[in-house]
């Protein structure tokens, strides 16, 4: 079995052991994505990247979040600028789309140092518990920081330097 086949099998059966990780784990001490692994940077160029856990926390704590039917308008309490974060749900191993348009999950570039199999996310949505990443919970106006398995198909909201 090739390494990629082995990894796919382990992911499919949720049998990844921390010892199977060779990057972003205890042995290499990395706590943030390298630029070479950042999909925003690879797709849109050097100025773009996935935001850190600290940047998501800043957004969550210093902005007004207004539900717009299929996502949030997030407005800065400091300068009034805003962005829109759609409730795009997330994708699982079989590529099924889950919880759209009630929830949104957004990756940060920061790993959960307590569990290297996971990274920090922001969760937004209508109801329920935060199991993955950064999540918003519209209707309850709930935005949470969560830790989720790195192989889940969550959205990204790139930022520029």
Label for each model-derived stretch:
Residues 1-161:
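Conserved positions within compact, well-structured domain cores
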